[in-house]
Amino acid sequence: MAVPTALTVQSTKGIRRVLPAFPTTVGEQLETLLGDIRPDAVKLGMLATDDVLLRIAHLLEGYDGPLVIDPVLRASDGSFLLERRAWPNLSERIIAGATLVTPNLAEAEALTGTRDPEEAARCMRDFGAKAVLITGGHASGDPDDFLLSDAGGQWLRGTRQATGPVHGTGCALSSAIAARLARGEDLLAAVERAKRFVERAIARAYAAGSGARLLRLEPVSD
């Protein structure tokens, strides 16, 4: 089940415009779904505006299942995908109740003020998140991720693949983790399996246009 928070005008070459959904519409859709079906996990990505964010935060206050947050802040060209004034509420109202937060290095720095992934993860735990996964796919070198939870911190190593820019890797990773948690898997297993799933999709990425390549997502059996 999905609740759209915005429409984007985009292609493989980037995002041209973001059209936020009406907060009342987002709230009504989410409230309608929650009144009918209890999701086994919830994943939040781009929220676009402070009003949409606050409406979602209010409606999820009573939700006690896994909550995965992909804190999408900016497009690759630097344009805002979550308005700047909403960033404090993202930390205080959304991240504070998260099972897992999955920022990339740039997002982690924007929200915490530090470029060090381990320190950024500790800061986001201080916001209230139960666990934090700082993803390294947008950094130079190998895409190593840092996971911090009640079990401690550990690095999850990755290998850079020579496919060039690939669209949607962070969204796919957070969604795959949420799907694993919905099945009842423990956090570390869910993260490791989701990471392998996305790495395979990156290895099979294909060019549909003249910009970033697209993930080729395939069914999994494990």
Kindly label every feature range from the protein language model:
Residues 1-76, 81, 220:
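Conserved N-terminal subdomain of the carbohydrate kinase-like
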Residues 34-37, 60, 64, 98, ...:
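Structural signal for hydrophobic packing residues in well-ordered secondary-structure cores
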Residues 84-153, 188:
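Conserved phosphate/ATP/ADP-binding segment of small-molecule kinases
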Residues 153-167:
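Short pre-catalytic strand/loop immediately N-terminal to key active-site residues, enriched for Gly-Thr
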Residues 188-222:
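Charged C-terminal helix
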